[in-house]
UniProtKB/Swiss-Prot annotation:
It comes from the Eukaryota. GO terms for molecular function: neuropeptide hormone activity. Its main location: secreted. It is found in: Secreted. One of its GO terms (cellular component) is extracellular region. It comes from Cryptocercus kyebangensis. This is Pyrokinin-5. InterPro entries: Pyrokinin_CS. The keyword Lipoprotein does not apply. Belongs to the pyrokinin family. The modification Leucine amide is found at L17. The keyword Manganese does not apply. GO terms for biological process: neuropeptide signaling pathway. Keywords: Amidation, Neuropeptide, Secreted.
Amino acid sequence: EGSGSGETSGMWFGPRL
């Protein structure tokens, strides 16, 4: 979740993953 978002929601903490 949060794939392609620069927010700390889920397992994506990058700028644009």
